[in-house]
From Swiss-Prot:
PANTHER family: 23S RRNA METHYLTRANSFERASE (PTHR30544), RADICAL SAM CORE DOMAIN-CONTAINING PROTEIN (PTHR30544:SF5). Disulfide bonds join 105-342. This is Dual-specificity RNA methyltransferase RlmN. S-adenosyl-L-methionine binds at residues 166-167, 198, 220-222, 299. NCBIfam families: rRNA_mod_RlmN. The lineage of its organism: Bacteria, Pseudomonadati, Pseudomonadota, Betaproteobacteria, Burkholderiales. The keyword Protein biosynthesis does not apply. It comes from Verminephrobacter eiseniae (strain EF01-2). [4Fe-4S] cluster binds at residues 112, 116, 119. It holds the Pfam family RlmN_N. The active site is at residues 92, 342. Residues 98-337 form the Radical SAM core domain. The gene is rlmN.
Length: 391
């Protein structure tokens, strides 16, 4: 007999489910607390629920995360789990412990259709959106697994970032109920300031998120001009930088923070020159947008054909931004020994969009162009990419 996974529901949805069982809607709050605050999956353990309700639930419902294929711990304390979401697809979630907080990085899709050049997930293509339950299950499993491991009843995960596999705003219908569970005081009680949705720039959905469930927003910028961003983040061809920045300004009217975080992956010789930093200063100044920059050292993977910027170059880049009064941080790479760092999450994806095939063809063409160019160019000029030039 088919049963309903209660992880799929926010509290209102769970109240509707209880009403369909002939139960009072307030029972949903009791049930919701058992599931999310206590991590219970056994209805018999839910001692303050009436026996009749528990018997009904056993016949028609379940509380179940996707099967865990593997769990890996990094030398720095980060933990990565690989979840089997069926049909040959697997997604990853990563816990990153720090002195004052514990952050969980959560996936929203099996694969990603955006196809950013520097992202391992994008090179795998796209299979499907995750359901609300599959998104929240990553938090449900991680929080309670970590509590058991640490032998504590205190909350372990204080921050959550939608920065795992997938573009969250291309799965907004499932994302919104999951966010409501994260924020619900009867669920995980996370602050809106401590839940961050990262997007490559789906402009209409930024506006919808602002209206329906504003949380902290991070934008994957990665380039100071459209010519370069078109190459690194193909979605830019649909929603160019000026449109994106205007959407960010509109978002700030609803956001729990008074700034937007711009993520910027530092790619050697591609987007990391001092001229690029000066262009960024001019860009955000012209847009008059309150922001901070998070510079991310690139985590190489074979298919990318890209290299990490030198540490001194990253610091020099940050200094230009900082001198202009822009708060700038350099992300500390965590979990790279278990392929859990930024841009490395890949899981397993059964590509239904042929994105991976197209990207492979593009890589072949780029390599051929580079070979042809190097044969024609002077040795000292080969392979150099100037500020603002496309790749």
């Amino acid at each position: 007999m088919s049963t309903t996974n209660l992880l799929e529901f926010d509290r209102d949805g769970l109240a509707d489910f209880c009403a369909r069982l002939g139960e009072k809607r307030f029972r949903a709050t009791q049930l919701f607390r058992w599931i999310h605050q206590r991590g219970a999956s056994d209805f018999d353990a839910m001692s303050d629920l009436a026996r009749a309700l528990r018997d009904k639930l056993k016949g028609c419902a379940r509380v179940q995360a996707p099967p865990v294929i593997s769990g890996q711990a990094s030398a720095d304390g980060s933990v990565k789990w690989l979840f089997d979401v069926g049909a040959g697809n697997a997604v990853e979630a990563v816990f990153i412990p720090e002195d004052e907080r514990g952050t969980l990085c959560v996936s929203s899709q099996a694969g990603c259709a955006v196809g950013c050049r520097f992202c391992s997930t994008g090179h795998q293509g796209f299979s499907r959106n995750l359901s609300s339950g599959e998104i929240i299950a990553q938090l449900w499993f991680a929080e309670h697994a970590l509590r058991r491991r640490l032998k504590t009843e205190d909350r372990v995960i204080s921050n959550l970032v939608m920065m795992g596999m997938g573009e969250p705003l291309q799965n907004l219908a499932a994302l919104l109920p999951a966010l409501r569970v994260m924020l619900d005081d009867h669920g995980y009680g996370l602050s809106r300031r401590r839940v961050t949705v990262s997007t490559s720039g789906v402009v209409p959905m930024i506006d919808r998120l602002a209206r329906d469930c504003p949380v902290a927003l991070a934008v994957s910028l990665h380039a100071p001009n459209d010519a370069l961003r078109d190459q690194l983040v193909p979605l830019n061809r649909k929603y160019p930088i000026d449109e994106l920045l205007q959407a960010c300004k509109r978002y700030l009217a609803h956001a729990p923070r008074d700034f937007i975080t711009f993520e910027y992956c530092m790619l050697d010789g591609v987007n990391d020159q001092i001229g690029h930093a000066r262009q960024l200063v001019e860009l955000v100044g012209r847009a008059a947008i309150r922001c901070k920059f998070n510079l991310i050292p690139f985590n190489p993977f074979p298919a990318s054909g890209l290299l990490r910027s030198a540490h001194d170059q990253i610091l020099a880049f940050a200094q230009v931004l900082g001198a202009a009064g822009i708060v700038t941080t350099v992300r500390k790479t965590r979990g790279d020994d278990i392929a859990a760092a930024c841009g490395q999450l890949a899981g397993d994806v059964r590509d239904r969009t042929r994105v991976a095939e197209r990207m492979a063809k593009q890589r072949t063409m780029q390599l051929q162009l580079q070979l042809n160019s190097s044969r024609r160019a002077e040795p000292s000029a080969a392979g150099v990419i100037g500020c603002g030039e496309s790749i």
